[in-house]
Amino acid sequence: MAFTDLLDALGGVGRFQLVYTALLLLPCGLLACHTFLQNFTAAAPPHHCQHPANYTEPTTNVSGVWLRAAIPLNQHGDPEPCRRYVEPQWALLKPNASSHGVATEGCKDGWVYDRSIFPSTIVMEWDLVCEARTLRDLAQSIYMSGVLVGAALFGGLADRLGRKAPLVWSYLQLAVSGAATAYVGSFSAYCVFRFLMGMTFSGIILNSLSLVVEWMPTRGRTVAGILLGFSFTLGQLILAGVAYLIRPWRWLQFAVSAPFLVFFLYSWWLPESSRWLLLHGKAQQAVQNLQKVAMMNGRKAEGERLTTEVVSSYIQDEFASVRTSNSILDLFRTPAIRRVTCCLMGVWFSNSVAYYGLAMDLQKFGLSIYLVQALFGIIDIPAMLVATTTMIYVGRRATVSSFLILAGLMVIANMFMPEDLQTLRTVQAALGKGCLASSFICVYLFTGELYPTEIRQMGMGFASVNARLGGLVAPLITTLGEISPVLPPVSFGATSVLAGMAVACFLTETRNVPLVETIAAMERRVKQGRSKRDTEQKSEEISLQQLGASPLKETI
């Protein structure tokens, strides 16, 4: 008997599973706010050099004659953001005047920013423009570095300490570091706290998904995994609305961080995974948790009959194979695990590269940043509805593979779209982003189902590490556009297509298949599958031989 049979006996997808899933997915939704927050808090508005200290700058009419005399214009007729005339050139106000040969200099006295849309951002506060413009991207890279470190750290800790402890700590760390970020007075301190915030991303996402999957019967796992994607989509829509209402970056930062204190407080009620407790010799606590589940699901009588012996019998065959400690090498220890791990490394990396390459720089589309953020969030809804349907009725492997290949083709096709068709290019990019978001959430669930319970968190943590590496590489690939504009879209699209092909060729289907508890059980399942296929193949060969022999005998 499998552990999922016990969950079915205690109510299946009952009230406990619904409440538990909702309480875990709500924080996951707000994580999207932090991931894409710098689209708003680090937005770079139009700007130009501040005038010399001995020059009196009018307080109104920033596009008036004084600006034409003090700031050179670029090829589009806009003020140069990083240069100014050494001396005001009033002669340029005359018709047909030329600025050729006029001496210019850098912005020695700072910058003037257009505050009509953003009253304050970190770019304005610390002048992250011109020579310092790379620091803006550095801050986001540091956040993604934190996500990378968190994936490596929390994945291993969760398999050793349980799912709940790292999750509770991550809520607290994000609440504190997020609020502290809103009060820092220097860019270096801002980066430190952004790093700490990034670490919690993996701690929350990975442990929330594992808890949902491990408390959910087989028939409810697909919908639960897709709901995680919808929560992330909801978070992007919330960010667009909150950022539109709260424009100052410090208040916006605080607004999306404070709710995690509430999540920290109620997370103490969340029970630990009984699967993990049983596999680590804590059967009594597992029984207590299961009895609470039974009571909440209206199966109090069934819960009272539970004992440690009864509960342990559901995974008794697995206890003999459980290792008391695990290491990263366990992800490569056996052929079946090694095949899954190597394939997922490429899939997570490729998905992340393409996803963040599209979603982390909304200003490049030339439309309202709030509108683009909302569009990039809304597009996930129909995409995930399709993903939900195909995952339930077709399977995980076909769904993930199809979305990755489709997204890659759309990203490549986008580079052939004329640049003056900004709206059409944005819509096409949004469709590609929707496919990538759907494949992302599908592969989260797929990965959790592919790995056995004893190393599930470590496997998901390691896979997430590869995704974070992709997030770090994405900005570097974007810079290849300075060499050739076709390199970034080709790189993003090609990696996505290759990842989709790898899923189709090397991973097995997990739809309606009970979760595997140990590495040994996974190896047995793979061997049994091969034996069954070999038997079927031999039967077909014998049948074909007999079919071919009959006419020959009749002829003779």
UniProtKB/Swiss-Prot annotation:
Keyword RNA-binding: no
GO CC field: membrane
Top-rank taxon, per record: Eukaryota
Biological-process GO terms, alphabetical: monoatomic ion transport; organic anion transport
GO molecular function: organic anion transmembrane transporter activity
Cellular compartments annotated: Membrane
Ranges of the Extracellular topological domain: 37-137, 188-194, 247-250, 361-366, 419-425, 479-485
Region (Disordered): 526-556
Tissues/organs with expression: Highly expressed in olfactory mucosa. Weakly expressed in testis. Not detected in heart, spleen, lung, kidney or brain.
InterPro entries referenced in this protein's UniProt entry, alphabetically: MFS_dom, MFS_sugar_transport-like, MFS_trans_sf
TM stretches of this protein: 16-36, 138-158, 167-187, 195-215, 226-246, 251-271, 340-360, 367-387, 398-418, 426-446, 458-478, 486-506
Glycosylated residue positions: 39, 54, 61, 96
Membrane topology field: Multi-pass membrane protein
Biased composition (Basic and acidic residues): 526-541
SUPFAM superfamilies per record: MFS general substrate transporter (SSF103473)
UniProt keywords, alphabetically: Glycoprotein, Ion transport, Membrane, Transmembrane, Transmembrane helix, Transport
Main location per the UniProt record: membrane
Cytoplasmic membrane side: 1-15, 159-166, 216-225, 272-339, 388-397, 447-457, 507-556
Family, per entry: Belongs to the major facilitator (TC 2.A.1) superfamily. Organic cation transporter (TC 2.A.1.19) family.
Function: Organic anion transporter that mediates the uptake of estrone sulfate. Inhibited by probenecid, propionate, 2-methylbutyrate, 3-methylbutyrate, benzoate, heptanoate and 2-ethylhaxanoate. May act as an odorant transporter.
Descriptive protein name: Solute carrier family 22 member 20
Chain's gene name: Slc22a20
